[in-house]
């Protein structure tokens, strides 16, 4: 059992028969009354997100999530296909369940498949990935790193804000947790 006050982003727990992943969690102390935990959560099975509050001492069953190394193969229609790199088993995951993760991975990228028992519940991508810029505004002469930046579309369709000196065709390192530009590769 885990108390609500110990829940952090990325953790998974069971509540009311649902498997829930914490997206955001914060303590809130109103002017009057007791402290509450404000949370943004996602139902792992349905993909729906919702906001809720809990008392800090409420207890939940922490879900045991196992991960296996895998490779992203391809996407067809509304299904993404992955292969376990140890057993060569293939997994089909609805695109709706891994939509955000697919913005950071290319075909043949290494990932980790997350399991709850025998049920595939998600994909864990590396903390940083290298992607190529496919579309952005032309560079401005004399641009510096301190400028406000410009939007750039990457090869997966992800749009990130980049410094003004970045050009089409350059490889960038992207932070997958924040969805932000880190540096040129």
From Swiss-Prot:
It holds the Pfam family EFP_N. GO terms for molecular function: translation elongation factor activity. It is found in: Cytoplasm. Its main location: cytoplasm. It comes from the Bacteria. GO terms for cellular component: cytoplasm. Pathway: Protein biosynthesis; polypeptide chain elongation. Gene3D superfamilies: 2.30.30.30, Nucleic acid-binding proteins. GO terms for biological process: peptide biosynthetic process. Keywords: Cytoplasm, Elongation factor, Protein biosynthesis. InterPro entries: Elong-fact-P_C (IPR015365), NA-bd_OB-fold (IPR012340), Rib_uL2_dom2 (IPR014722), Transl_elong_fac_P/YeiP (IPR020599), Transl_elong_KOW-like (IPR013185), Transl_elong_P/YeiP_cen (IPR001059), Transl_elong_P/YeiP_CS (IPR013852), Transl_elongation_fac_P (IPR011768). Belongs to the elongation factor P family. Involved in peptide bond synthesis. Stimulates efficient translation and peptide-bond synthesis on native or reconstituted 70S ribosomes in vitro. Probably functions indirectly by altering the affinity of the ribosome for aminoacyl-tRNA, thus increasing their reactivity as acceptors for peptidyl transferase. This is Elongation factor P. The gene is efp.
